[in-house]
Swiss-Prot record:
Keyword hit for Flavoprotein: no
Keyword hit for Transferase: yes
Enzyme class: transferase
Recorded family membership: Belongs to the CobT family.
EC numbers for this chain: 2.4.2.21
Alphabetized InterPro entries for the sequence: Nict_dMeBzImd_PRibTrfase, Nict_dMeBzImd_PRibTrfase_bact, Nict_dMeBzImd_PRibTrfase_N, Nict_dMeBzImd_PRibTrfase_sf
Pathway: Nucleoside biosynthesis; alpha-ribazole biosynthesis; alpha-ribazole from 5,6-dimethylbenzimidazole: step 1/2
Keyword terms, alphabetized: Cobalamin biosynthesis, Glycosyltransferase, Transferase
Any Pfam family hit: DBI_PRT
Protein name listed in UniProt: Nicotinate-nucleotide--dimethylbenzimidazole phosphoribosyltransferase
PANTHER family, alphabetized: NICOTINATE-NUCLEOTIDE--DIMETHYLBENZIMIDAZOLE PHOSPHORIBOSYLTRANSFERASE
Functional summary from the UniProt entry: Catalyzes the synthesis of alpha-ribazole-5'-phosphate from nicotinate mononucleotide (NAMN) and 5,6-dimethylbenzimidazole (DMB).
Native source organism of the sequence: Clostridium tetani (strain Massachusetts / E88)
Amino acid sequence: MVIIMKLLEETLRRIKPADEEVIKKAWSRMDSLSKPIGSLGKLEEIAVQISGITGKVKNEINKKMTVIMCSDNGICEEGVSACPQELTALLAENYVKEITGIGVLSKHVNADMCVVDIGIKSDVKDSRILNKKVAYGTKNMAKEPAMTREEAVKAIETGIELVDKFVKEGYDLFGTGEAGIGNTATSAAVISVLSQIDSDKIVGKGSGLTDEGFLNKKRAVKQAIEINKPNKEDVIDVIAKIGGFDIAGICGCFLGAAKNRVPIVIDGIISASAALCAYKMNANVKDFLISSHLSAEPGIEYVTGAIGLKPCLHMEMRLGEGSGCPLQFFMIESALCLMNNMATLAEASIVDSEFLVDIREK
């Protein structure tokens, strides 16, 4: 069967790397500011990275949004989560009420949210939740493929379409979030296959499991990989067999952001697994990714290591939802504010600056 995926193929063709010439100009300005070279650390790197993304040395964020993909996972049948599956729909409904972690933090930093039903097992009633349902949850990947290849492509393209739409509406900074009971299991499976690392090293306790439950989760993830035998060279095959609609949709968001040349933030382990998928499809995606925090889930370090990213925050967070994105939005806007408004050495009347050495780590 021939699968139509024109949007995905076009998107992958259009993703180009960051502008190296503008990056050089941005570093030249950053290093001319009235401070020891490198003294603003990660803030300097963020500002310069965004210059390379946009093609402009000075940048401002006009509108920012976290896209939250909500979906259920059939592997919950294996008892891989301490939470009931019905919680996915409830979380989605609470997101739009702005009473969850991501809702409160987004409001605090004046960021918008788009809550998407991409595969919740039930029909949610709140009209503020965008209905992009591919199916009523995935199948139990410990027994069969989680979804068809067609469904995987549809979910990925949903993410691309949403970013395309929001860029046209003026959004120029994106975050990624999710809700999906059991999705730390699917994320661990995807990361294990794409990074070729034993799943036992990647599976974490998620929302909290007993020691017995943790062992069972490891078993279920390993069984899913062994039964489905996903092809590590084919990201769509990996997502279809052992992934989730949320992972696929977020992967599409990363691809869409890279195509549209806007920065996009990784939250925790689920969006990190989706980022790894996007990176494996087109390595240029890396230039548009900003890793918000080092999740307490063990798999995150394998992802950031594989892509070559350094999480900005180390706060022992593991909530998910996209909760790291609003925190990172504030850091990004702070970095751009410094680049745009800080005085240069000359403007600050620091004529003899030879004493200011480069203190960056080599």
